[in-house]
């Protein structure tokens, strides 16, 4: 008899919570259905071939060879129950040697009406936190992190010229908390290879 009573009590406590989850909100107004804005990063979904440009370090080699031209791939998948995108960015030098591998989770924050991202620099074991917002057909992102030499930086980036077959990305960096900026610290031109990226 006591077992039956415990089961009935457990069912009474669990069923209302499960029922509200099916209708998009749960206890305390928790929203479980992603809003329309959670699709703003959908342009990134798929597989991309990249042309990457970074400023040359200067000196004689830079005058002779010019700005280094790098290549890469960017793969992205919808995820997080419709709330965001998971992506992987790989950059290699002209000989195919790996230079950078990052893995990012981008989730729409319905309360802040913007994006929150966490990016892991795999080779350097560094994590960068950022935010983003969709404005005038561009995705604008800001972040704080540590560069390959261990210097703290602030970055501002934008995804622009977004079409079904391509997009461009530019990241500017500041090493002094945003007082001065190196514009175009990274420039990427992406061309779609596939609508769905393999894992």
Give names to the regions the model predicted.
Residues 4-16:
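Bacterial N-terminal signal peptides
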